[in-house]
């Protein structure tokens, strides 16, 4: 008996159907010599700091850094039942070996291995590694199972990624939270991503538009523009001179035959970028839709960083293109050309090939899919047809004219063969760059043309563009790429599988927010995000360092870098950060959340703000506090109210009436005075104004 362990129930059911495990058990399927079960995501996770020492339950600066010598793991509270099922299945005497069928990637490997080790299992493991959930791909995968030991390096890389994130996240979050008196979430990848948004927004705020001017010659069938000028008077003078001249001489006519190559197939990041541009989808939405399509056997594995197919897939491409073209009605009257060599390159495929629709998609009722999945599937189908198409060819004409001693220029573009663009429907990727400039009339050098008019054009320089998810994904993908040697396999921060989650986490934590209309949303930093980047040191927010870590993780995955050395570097960086970091002076003003101020602290003069529990001095070093659940006032039969707190803060005293004494069983009036000690802590004294 073999135990197959998938990542999700839906995947487990697809595998069970193909291998004949058709008898349902409690949390598993059984049949034909197989048991098939699932993990439901991360069943086993790293323990929190307090599991190592109870003192870590409270966040204290003096306890940092927290660097576990022996890592501890725990079963997720929400998935204990499924973990128990898996443990029993692994311990069954008739189970001789296991098949790891979690997602074929770094995180999928980690999910399986952590469960395997937490259960104390020692049985041999084989690996199912597939890029499609189609029945044929599953059958082939089970026929070509690989020894689990081949993926030990992949597991090491996953462990390093998880533990590095824990070390940086736990220590940096506690460090800055303790120093600045509020929870400040810091992450190995999250914070550099935030820093890019903050810096872009700062550049936009600092940008000062500069006006520019130019003269434009108007002919009967076209226009020609002159060079930009900073001074309006200079441009106006040129306009007047051109009007006086009344004509222009054609000094240059240059014609070139050009072509535009078909776009590459999609990897996850390029698909997310295109879906954001065309459809306004967030990166997470695109990943979710594509994952759903994958589990329905309609597209191949989504979390890939490759835009090519493997050499052995070349014979399959023509038939796939044909059935997809007909099924999706992509100009079906004439077969699309298929230049398969354009999309085939095994050397550029890492774990998984590019995302493409499957043959199953060709026979599927697409109208039954949710609209988001329909849109993504259609986008993938169109891209497949375009990617194997012929180049788009066009004639480009550059014309220069002279008038009043100045040069004017225009460009024309005439498409001679639409090629792949006839299937594209909507503009693809650099559409604005590829837009046609229009036809020009027949012109020759030396011709004199009468002017139909001369216009003064005014404009302003543009600020940097705000980040959309498209642009931020691009920035994450290429972060510090200029610092890496040519030929490295992956650059940037995060991975295709994690970038969407990073963006969503920044939004959820309130560091960035989405602004704009339904189609185009911009990612903008909040005050909270700006404040965090202000106080976090360069090594934490640097895309360069994070990209370097990502590169080393990839090398660990390929057995080219020592995992212990990597973890040592992470620990050293964090230890150095804790020892050397000093709180930024004045940053407490930036870090202060909005609150209702009731007055100035009688001890230090800072603002006194209301919170859920009372009224406290905003200066964290000052101990002045008026608790809402105040024992002193409760013994008087009184509750601390906002009005009472205001009187104590601003006047140093408050008059209380109808106070009750349990000892004498009598009511009385009194004046309560507030005094402060050296640390600012409040103390109360009563001044009696007579009994009642």
Protein language model features and the residues they cover:
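Conserved short loop/turn motifs at secondary-structure junctions
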Residues: 1, 99-104, 181-183, 255-264, ...
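Intrinsically disordered, low-complexity regulatory segments
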Residues: 1-162, 166, 463
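Basic, low-complexity terminal or inter-domain segments flanking catalytic cores
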Residues: 2-3, 25, 79, 90, ...
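Amphipathic alpha-helical transducer elements in NTP-driven molecular machines
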Residues: 9-16, 33-36, 40, 76-87, ...
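C-terminal or mid-to-C-terminal helical accessory/interaction module adjacent to the motor/catalytic core
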Residues: 93, 135-219, 255-259
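Conserved ATP-binding/catalytic motifs of P-loop helicase motor domains
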Residues: 124, 194, 299
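Metal- or metallocofactor-binding catalytic centers and their adjacent structured scaffolds
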Residues: 232-266, 272
């Amino acid at each position: 008996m073999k135990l197959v362990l998938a990542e999700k129930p839906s995947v487990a059911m697809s595998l069970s159907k193909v291998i004949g495990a058709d008898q349902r058990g409690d949390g598993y399927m059984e049949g034909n010599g197989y048991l098939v079960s699932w993990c439901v995501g991360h069943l086993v996770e790293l323990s929190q700091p307090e599991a190592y020492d109870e003192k870590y339950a409270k966040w204290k600066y003096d306890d940092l850094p927290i660097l576990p010598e022996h890592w501890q793991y725990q079963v997720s509270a929400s998935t204990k039942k499924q973990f128990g099922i898996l443990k029993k299945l692994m311990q069954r005497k008739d189970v001789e070996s296991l098949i790891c069928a979690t997602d074929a990637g770094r995180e999928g490997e980690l999910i399986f291995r952590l469960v395997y080790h937490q259960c104390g299992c020692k049985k041999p493991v084989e690996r199912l590694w597939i890029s499609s959930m189609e029945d044929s791909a599953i059958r082939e995968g089970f026929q070509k199972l690989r020894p689990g030991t081949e993926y030990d390096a992949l597991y090491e890389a996953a462990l390093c990624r998880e533990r590095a994130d824990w070390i940086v996240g736990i220590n940096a979050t506690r460090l800055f939270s303790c120093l600045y008196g509020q929870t400040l979430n810091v992450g190995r990848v999250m914070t550099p991503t935030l820093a890019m948004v903050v810096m872009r927004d700062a550049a936009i705020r600092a940008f000062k538009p500069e006006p520019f001017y130019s003269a434009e010659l108007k002919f009967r069938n076209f226009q020609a523009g002159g060079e930009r000028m900073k001074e309006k008077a200079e441009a106006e003078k040129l306009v007047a001179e051109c009007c006086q001249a009344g004509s222009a001489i054609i000094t240059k006519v240059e014609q070139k035959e050009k072509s535009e190559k078909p776009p590459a197939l999609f990897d996850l990041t390029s698909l997310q970028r295109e879906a954001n541009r065309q459809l306004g989808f967030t990166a997470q939405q695109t990943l979710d839709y594509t994952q759903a399509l994958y589990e329905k056997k309609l597209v191949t594995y989504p979390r890939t960083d490759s835009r090519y197919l493997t050499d052995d897939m070349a014979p399959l491409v023509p038939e796939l293109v044909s059935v997809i073209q007909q099924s999706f009605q992509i100009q079906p009257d004439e077969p699309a050309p298929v230049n398969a060599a354009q999309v085939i390159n095994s050397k550029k495929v890492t774990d998984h090939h590019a995302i493409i629709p499957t043959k199953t998609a060709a026979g599927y009722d697409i109208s039954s899919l949710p609209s988001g999945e329909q849109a993504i599937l259609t986008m993938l189908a169109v891209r497949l047809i375009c990617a194997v198409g012929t180049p788009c060819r066009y004639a480009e004409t550059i014309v220069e004219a002279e008038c009043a001693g100045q040069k004017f220029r225009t460009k024309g573009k005439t498409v001679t063969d639409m090629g792949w663009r006839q299937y594209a429907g909507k503009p693809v990727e650099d559409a604005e760059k590829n837009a046609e400039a229009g036809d020009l009339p027949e012109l020759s050098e030396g011709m004199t043309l009468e002017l139909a008019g001369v216009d003064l054009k005014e404009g302003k320089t543009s600020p940097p563009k705000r980040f959309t998810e498209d642009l931020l994904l691009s920035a994450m993908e290429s972060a510090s790429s200029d610092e890496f040697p040519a030929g490295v396999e992956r650059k940037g921060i995060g991975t295709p599988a994690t970038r969407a989650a990073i963006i969503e986490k920044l939004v959820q934590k309130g560091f960035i927010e989405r602004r704009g209309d339904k189609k185009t949303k911009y990612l903008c930093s909040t005050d909270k995000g700006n404040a965090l980047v202000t106080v976090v040191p360069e090594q934490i927010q640097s895309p360069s360092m994070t990209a370097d870590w990502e590169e080393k993780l990839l090398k660990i995955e390929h057995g080219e870098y020592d995992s212990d050395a990597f973890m040592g570097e992470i620990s050293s960086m964090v230890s150095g950060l804790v020892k050397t970091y000093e709180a930024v002076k004045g940053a407490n003003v930036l870090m202060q959340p909005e609150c209702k101020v009731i007055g100035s602290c009688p001890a230090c003069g800072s603002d006194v703000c209301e919170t859920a529990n009372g009224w406290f001095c905003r200066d964290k070093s000052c101990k002045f506090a008026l608790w809402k659940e105040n024992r002193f006032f409760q013994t008087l039969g009184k509750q601390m109210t906002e009005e009472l707190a205001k009187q104590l803060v601003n006047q140093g005293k408050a008059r209380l009436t109808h106070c009750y004494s349990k000892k004498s069983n009598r009511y009385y009036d009194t004046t309560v005075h507030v005094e402060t000690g050296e640390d600012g802590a409040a103390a109360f004294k009563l001044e009696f104004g007579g009994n009642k």
